[in-house]
């Protein structure tokens, strides 16, 4: 998998993802998209040249991000997950979903979001430590809890996005 860029973010990123999707033969290019049709459409348009490609869609799930960044409730976020993963699935069978700011997300809500994303067709679930909040032992515990509390987790690959902001 080549995480090639965020196509909607700029013309340069769109062009770079398109160029990569046109040139790769044995790798799978991936584009990043917020949980909106416009972002997912841009991903598809930039990736459609590849034999196989992945769309990686995400939405914030932590209380602080949902309140101050998205101005959305839990129910609205769940609706956006359902809509975006289902929409991305129309373009490719390879859909990755991320719970942005996952390490600051309420665990019970995280389990619901992951279960829903998989139910809607996500084949990879990414757990990001968006703000570098978690130490390795805590992050490992979170992954174990996800494995033990998300009933359909066996239908997806677990992926991680970590930072070393603490210099550990």
Where are these regions (language model features)?
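Histidine-centered divalent metal-coordination motifs
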Residues: 159-163
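Beta-alpha junction/loop-to-helix N-cap segments that form part of ligand/metal-binding clefts
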Residues: 32-36
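Alpha/beta enzyme core
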Residues: 1, 11-24, 37-158
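Thiamine diphosphate
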Residues: 164-168
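Divalent metal-dependent hydrolysis catalytic cores, especially in the metallo-beta-lactamase
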Residues: 2-7, 30
């Amino acid at each position: 998998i080549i995480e090639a860029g965020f196509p909607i973010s700029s013309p340069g990123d769109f062009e770079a993802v398109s160029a990569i999707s046109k040139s790769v033969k044995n790798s799978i290019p991936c584009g990043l998209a917020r949980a909106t049709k416009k972002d997912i459409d841009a991903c598809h348009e930039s990736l459609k040249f590849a034999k196989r490609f992945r769309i990686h869609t995400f939405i914030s799930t932590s209380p602080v991000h949902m309140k101050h960044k998205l101005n959305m409730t839990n129910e609205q976020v769940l609706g956006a997950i359902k809509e975006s993963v289902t929409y991305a699935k129309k373009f490719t069978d390879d859909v990755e979903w991320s719970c942005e700011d996952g390490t600051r997300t309420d665990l019970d809500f995280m389990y619901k979001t992951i279960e829903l994303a998989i139910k809607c067709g996500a084949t990879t679930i990414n757990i990001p430590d968006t703000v570098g909040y978690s130490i390795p032992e805590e992050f490992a515990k979170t992954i174990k809890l996800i494995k033990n509390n998300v009933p359909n987790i066996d239908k997806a690959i677990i992926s991680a996005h970590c930072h070393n902001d603490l210099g550990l």
